[in-house]
């Protein structure tokens, strides 16, 4: 999954991921440093990595729970930092 952070947004491709399979997030930034945090449907932080300009950091996660996951920036990156939220969906293809 390709992820890029920018003031003050995340771009995510694709936005639907499979449950029960390892997913690799390739995370970068187009401007300043950002903190890439993945939160499960219950609001718990389940993984994090730095998003930095000029670098691609890899985060690997396996999602056992279907539902809506949120991405939040956890490193202050400017005045609208608090609005830097995105989401993706995890679906179970076995159902």
Where are these predicted regions, by residue range?
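Short acidic, gly/pro-rich beta-turn/loop elements at beta-sheet edges
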Residues: 13, 35-37, 46, 69-71, ...
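Short amphipathic alpha-helical surface micro-motifs
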Residues: 18-19, 40-43, 68-72
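Beta-strand cores of secreted/periplasmic/IMS beta-sandwich domains, seen most often
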Residues: 1-7, 11-36, 57-65
